Amino acid sequence: YNPFAYIHSEKDILKLVTTLIANTKGEGKAGDDFWVKAETLLYTALIGYIHYEAPVEEQNFSTLIEFINAMEVREDDEDFKNPVDLMFEELKKRKPDHFAVRQYAKFKLSAGKTAKSILISCGARLAPFDIQELRELTAYDELQLDTLGDRKTALFIIMSDTDDTFNFLISMCYTQLFNLLCEKADDVYGGRLPVHVRCLIDEAANIGQIPRLEKLVATIRSREISCCLVLQAQSQLKALYKDSADTIVGNMDLSLIHISEPTRRTP
């Protein structure tokens, strides 16, 4: 599964970055969104460059990691330019209004020490993608998510029940799936997919956060898409989606609750 394979516009880049930020951890101070915003600018710039300028076989997270690794910062030399700086300078000469160039220029407003801290946070957030297993998993795509509503298809996404290291990939997959199918329903099929797509999301609280899920569950049904969230307890949804949890439940057509007896202990 390669999330880059489903990027077709600047809007798709922003959606991918939002999902990445929501389901991974950086090194910024808790409660301070400065680092998150700064990272967002950098990811948007680099992914924009990769999508629009890199060969197809290099459009993946491995290339993003290589870009981050090449971004050396020297606090005592503000005029120093790393390979990525030079790469963007060359692109700016050819395409001064390029989406990636504009985003990178905003990131470069940060001073040397601040830029170094941002890069450290990026490295921490992207650490899972530096594992060989995940590099291979995201090197190319064979899921063809945008075809699920064209014909009857069964796609099983299986995660480990003991290790949640890679669970954020599943939330990323669902986010792209919903966006792709909604756009295809509207642009190709006049508003409704020819084949109903039913997503049975077991352990929904353990796959990471799907951005804007409270709005998605209210709008996807009209496109012949349905979503069934399976939870151990409704409090799990509250812990993950905070104030949006009640809205998510309210936008569901049906709620089934299985009440189990508490374990009785003999004295």
Which residues make up each language-model segment?
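Short, intrinsically disordered, charge-balanced linker/junction segments flanking boundaries
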Residues: 14-18, 251-253, 264
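Conserved H-loop
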Residues: 232-236
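Structural recognition of the conserved hydrophobic beta-strand(s) that form the central parallel beta-sheet
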Residues: 226-231
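P-loop NTPase motor domains
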Residues: 1-225, 240, 257-258
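Single conserved hydrophobic/aromatic residue that forms the stacking wall/gate
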Residues: 257-267
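A short helix-turn-beta junction within AAA+ P-loop NTPase domains corresponding to the substrate/partner-engaging
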Residues: 244-256
